[in-house]
Amino acid sequence: MKIIIAPLGGLIGAILGGILWAKYIQWTGNTAGFIAIGIGALTGIGMLLTCSGAIETNAKKHWLMVAFGAAVFAIAGIFIGKYLDVQWNAVPQIAEQLMANEPNLLEEAAISIAETQYSGQTKWEHMKDRMDWFDLLFGLIAVFVAFYITFNSRVRNIIYKFGGSN
């Protein structure tokens, strides 16, 4: 039963990290790709906390699989964050840009135009438009962080002591 529950920590970390990233973008207006590293950390720690009772500390082959799982969940968390960013923030930001370019444009008209522009593209196109090359770099670092947290025995021991496991 414990082995079935083990990946839930990574999934919860990915979802929580993605939501927090999208909210950060909504609150500040900055994409802040470096927050992806936090998604990797949340995913790795979540995976580690839920796996701690199911896998022996020195079972390297099992921890390697857990580390790959954490890396996959980190990627999923980044996509969740980008998807929610588009869902929550694309139309208001397009409307703000329209009003900045056309000072006489009313907010209702700008939102209507923004919704038309938004509906003309797929979510994937909007996600690509809202990503920079630095986001890819931070995404790779996030994947490494998630992998490293779960695979490195010293980090595991620190988390175990903090989490009260083993």
Regions found by a protein language model. Give the residues of each.
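Core subunits and conserved enzymes of cellular information-processing
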Residues: 42, 48-166
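Transmembrane alpha-helical insertion/packing segments
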Residues: 1-43
